[in-house]
């Protein structure tokens, strides 16, 4: 039997700010509810539930976090585990290829552990069914030759994350005690996150510089932290007007804008692919399949990575005939050329 696809630190090395994999410096992640910025109502409810579970001596209910990629679902799982004092195990549904892998993973859990499964919607139905008994009765059935052995699991909390809650089987969805919807962040929240992360990265930055990067971060902390690292690269090696930018220079609006421009990112966080999308739908409604063909991108990239921010920013709208740029979207195209 293959070893379970399990890791304690969810990390990857994406090649662009559009990747859905996490690449953040662990030092940038919040470590407590007090340290977590944004998602105020969700945090208030979670704080209350965790406090009650600790005081009452019961295990925290299983929870599902739904929302766009990069808005803090993995970070929130880490905070919950830390607040509970339990060990966090992290995996993703695409990494689990058959039922035996998931059963083996569940069998490794200890009393009070927290299991975080990302991209829960990607489970094959027969694999997700293994979770039903585990979540409801804390048991799993393990094959042993021609027999099946039922194994009792310790008390644990499953935290699931998805960008497509509607794709989850209803029996799985119904087994979560809470379903929380995480949203994109406001400009004020993003500015606070950028300022805090810049401090942790040792990057002197003024308020205007933080706001400039926050505006380009598409309401997503993960993107903000990646952009910060690229700005750090820029200040450490860019040639500006015949000389290098001093590494310890305070990063203001001008340097932030120059670094973003070098990356091809405009002041609203749009890159060349976003602008190509916007130009494609500027004059008439276009269906999703035609957009995918024209941009040579798969549907999940269009729907998960491009459209959420364009809609949040009021640059496009979706209707029965397809996607169409708004007046603001056409204005943005005219502004950036």
Predicted features along the sequence, with ranges:
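Conserved C-terminal helix/linker of AAA+ ATPases
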Residues: 234-264, 274, 325-328
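Pre-Walker A (pre-P-loop) alpha-helix and adjacent loop at the N terminus of AAA/AAA+ ATPase modules
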Residues: 23-68, 103, 208, 213
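C-terminal helical "lid" of AAA+/P-loop NTPase domains
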Residues: 211-216, 222-237, 276-279, 290, ...
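Walker A/P-loop
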Residues: 51-93, 104-111, 132, 163
